[in-house]
UniProtKB/Swiss-Prot annotation:
Other observations noted: The active site is a redox-active disulfide bond.
Annotated compartments: Cytoplasm
Record GO terms (molecular function): thioredoxin-disulfide reductase (NADPH) activity
List of residues binding FAD: 31-39, 281-290
A Pfam family hit: Pyr_redox_2
Alphabetical list of InterPro entries matching this protein: FAD/NAD-bd_sf, FAD/NAD-binding_dom, Ferredoxin-NADP_redctase_2, Pyr_nucl-diS_OxRdtase_2_AS, Thioredox_Rdtase
Annotated S-S bridges: 133-136
Record's protein name: Thioredoxin reductase
Organism field: Helicobacter pylori (strain ATCC 700392 / 26695) (Campylobacter pylori)
UniProt KW keywords: Cytoplasm, Disulfide bond, FAD, Flavoprotein, NADP, Oxidoreductase, Redox-active center
Subunit structure: Homodimer.
């Protein structure tokens, strides 16, 4: 039987694996179908992780994490997990190929995925001017003009954040009304650096080998078209947590989740199910930063070690 099964191979999962193996967990297994690393491997530039002296790609940044974990004995099961369920005092992990595994404890570190828009050019320039993280990438556009797409709290809050860094921020929304908190909207409207473009849609993201250069936008009320010359385009149209592994045969969830599907945990990353932990972007109130996900993974692993000692 597996002592600790870690579902997901991003920064949270790998950190959990490192701390678990170095902490004496003899049989820790990482379940990740492809090479571990997580969605951060798709980033073209990492600059805000402590100790990283030069800008590196997400792929290069995560490679040593994998090597370090495997060096300390973390095992890698290259399969996707379909479902995690509990049977008596242990967990049953069902893989997509029908194979099952049993584990004494489980850390869910499956993360989440920003919703895509399908705008022409989005995939081509993803990570090359198209971003879903102002905290991660805003600094690259210091004193430059950028555009933000979205009408919820996150979009408006990130527009305000970017206004502290950038020369100008265009906030694009397909409707005249916003779904964010009124006080947040008021702060954005009172910021001279933020220009509201409503009701507008983005028809195309344009650029060249160096990245994004402009956006083609259209007013849905008048059909007026404009070209915004911006090197950075931030998309905030929603976020999907990858919690499908929690869904049971009767459609219930293995553990408590909030209204967005994020796993409810305490400060030690414990869920309401004994022996089940969660870390990284899958949990409630996740900051969605690599350094925070790594911290979560370490915390979850330490909690697992304590759990295994007493059970």
């Amino acid at each position: 039987m597996i002592d600790c099964a870690i579902i997901g191979g991003g920064p949270a999962g790998l950190s959990a694996g490192l701390y678990a193996t170095r902490g004496g967990v003899k049989n820790a297994v990482l379940f990740e179908k492809g090479m571990p690393g997580g969605q951060i491997t798709g980033s073209s530039e990492i600059e805000n992780y402590p100790g990283v002296k030069e800008v590196v790609s997400g792929l290069d940044f995560m490679q040593p994490w994998q090597e370090q974990c495997f060096r300390f004995g973390l095992k890698h099961e290259m399969t996707a997990v379909q479902r995690v369920s509990k049977k008596d005092s242990h967990f049953v992990i069902l893989a997509e190929d029908g194979k099952t595994f049993e584990a004494k404890s489980v850390i869910i570190a499956t993360g989440g995925s920003p919703k895509r828009t399908g705008i022409k050019g989005e995939s081509e320039y993803w990570g090359k001017g198209v971003s879903t993280c102002a905290t991660c990438d805003g600094f690259f556009y210091k004193n430059k003009e950028v555009a933000v797409l979205g009408g919820g709290d996150t979009a408006v809050e990130e527009a305000i954040y970017l206004a502290n860094i950038c020369k100008k921020v265009y906030l694009i929304h397909r409707r005249d009304g916003f779904r964010c908190a009124p006080i947040t909207l008021e702060h954005a409207k009172n910021n001279d650096k933020i220009e509201f473009l409503t009701p507008y849609v983005v028809e195309e993201i344009k650029g060249d080998a160096s990245g994004v250069s402009s956006l083609s936008i259209k007013n849905t009320a008048t059909n007026e078209k404009r070209e915004l010359v911006v090197p950075g385009f931030f998309i905030f149209v929603g976020y999907d947590v990858n919690n499908a592994v929690l869904k049971q045969e009767d459609n219930s969830m293995l553990c408590k989740c909030d209204e967005y599907g994020s796993i409810v945990v305490d400060f030690s990353m414990k869920t309401n199910v004994q022996g089940l932990f969660a870390a990284g972007d899958i949990r409630i109130f996740a900051p969605k930063q690599v350094v925070c996900a790594a911290s979560d993974g370490a915390t979850a692993a330490l909690s697992v070690i304590s759990y295994l000692e007493h059970h």
